[in-house]
Amino acid sequence: LTPEQIEGFQHALVYAKKHPKPLLDMTQADYPLPEATKKVLQDAITTTQGRWGMCLVKGFPVDEWSEADMRVAYWGMGLYIGVGRTQNRASEVINDVRDAGGSYKVKGGRGYNTNAGLDFHQDSADVVSLLCRRTAKEGGTSKVMSSIALRDRVAELRPDLLHVLESNNWFHSFQNAQDSIQPPYYRCPLMGESGGYFCARTNRKNTIAAQRDFPDVPRLTAQQVEALDLLDIIMPSEEYCYTMELERGDMQLLNSFVTLHSHTPFEDYELPDEKRHLMRLWLSIPGSQPLPPQWAEYWGDSRAGAVRGGVRGSAITEDFLRYEKRQAEIMGMPCRGFKPVVTRKEMINIVSGV
């Protein structure tokens, strides 16, 4: 960021604090950015949808912001990018990524509230954004790899497994983050293509959780286990993995369809005000790619540029629904609203027929 761009974010925050509103009531007018500062965000998102699938923006003045300030500023930035998605059982739109004593590979476990190293995975939005407020004492290194490179390597080593990865017989746990009218697990291939755009979605932890927690879910075949094992061998390879140390004031943005990400375990500081802390936004964006039709079961919509993604959770409010509709209109994005593609009853029929 240039000094001019930083000043734009600072002035917008000053305005937002002088005219305070709940986050879900805010529009761009409540966080007014000058053109030079808007362009930073627009260029970053454009970069995620291009060749690299990722972007790192450095220099946000987080040391001058309180935690509450950063939440307002970060949400304000998102208003220029897309439509924020709910991220957990509590239906929160900004997640605090820090060690809150959670466990990772357990029923209902999520990675963002632990200090554990994470499996390579994709988040449930067109773009996942992390803004670093504080770093760990040691560890927490961010790792990113191309899912296109992953597919190409599978094609070299085990081309017979590509059709397995692209099949729709994969079941994954929602980890208790679904709406009450949704089944507790969903189907989604691990790889696919639509309109010339490749996409991947893999998170072995959630695939295994569906096997562990739901006896009615069809058991993984030998070929499916082989495919998962092969991915686990390829993904951490230094040949394919880009490593970065996120610093205070860094914003990392990732395209969830063409990148996978992870981080190493970390050791935190003792004092609460020194512990590792990042904030996470999940964003549906107007320039997103099309998805294969069967991916709509999880994503809610497979159309390019449509509002989709997120996990519904159990605490959706009318305020969020109004925000979602208003922000979709501002961004020019089609929005179907929430209606499960597959209901609990329909899923029972699906698994009984597999």
Residue ranges with predicted function:
Residues 67:
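Catalytic palm subdomain of template-directed nucleic-acid polymerases
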Residues 74-84:
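A short alpha->loop->secondary-structure connector
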